[in-house]
Amino acid sequence: MSKPVDHIKRPMNAFMVWSRGQRRKMAQENPKMHNSEISKRLGAEWKLLSEAEKRPYIDEAKRLRAQHMKEHPDYKYRPRRKPKNLLKKDRYVFPLPYLGDHDPLKTGLSMSATDSLLGASEKARAFLPPTSAPYSLLDPSQFSSTTIQKMTEMPHTLAASTLPYASTLGYQNGAFGGLSCPSQHTHTHPSPTNPGYVVPCNCSAWSASNLQPPVAYILFPGMTKAGLDPYSSAHTAAM
């Protein structure tokens, strides 16, 4: 690499004047010694010198400086910058090691933390539009035949066991129908072929006679139902 023509060297100081001869001598005595080690030893020896021993080298440095200023009156020290390619190489002197599977971000999460993250994602899914769901909840192809059969039997089971007043609320035939207006005797029931959809039907509307809750009677020998039923006894007295 050729040096620029306009580059002017700095004048030597007292240490450089002294070390110029000492460096050559030390390099001849220790040919395998690195240049940086030679500079370190020369610096240590220079500090051990007294002021009287340094005086001739200080005077020589002043003379060289005066001569340098006379030859280059407009001289200004401009340090040379490193080329850009060297700067790029120095940037990657200490590359980061690959941690692989020992990454603490992978192994540090416990099962509870993972479950909480999954639960948070499911809660966030509730605020998304329906089209963003990975699958349709009403798509019958997502369910097996056993699941569909259980879903069709579920309304009848609930109406017969857990809803004793289902008949008075318009749940006819054990199906989950919507309460409609008295003038329109139309209810909706789950489709037997596709439980995800409901279909209307024209079943009979609930009447006032169905509003009476079911009553269980215990009859002993010699007793009749008329004596126990207040509604029927009042009706007989009115007649």
Swiss-Prot record:
Assigned GO CC terms: nucleus
Location in or out of the cell: Nucleus
UniProt DNA-binding residue ranges: 8-76
Alphabetized UniProt keyword annotations: Developmental protein, DNA-binding, Nucleus, Repressor, Transcription, Transcription regulation
Annotated GO MF terms: sequence-specific DNA binding
Alphabetical list of InterPro entries matching this protein: HMG_box_dom, HMG_box_dom_sf, SOX_fam, SRY-related_HMG-box_TF-like
GO biological process, one term: negative regulation of DNA-templated transcription
Function: Acts as a negative regulator of transcription. May function as a switch in neuronal development.
Protein known as: Transcription factor Sox-14
Gene: sox14
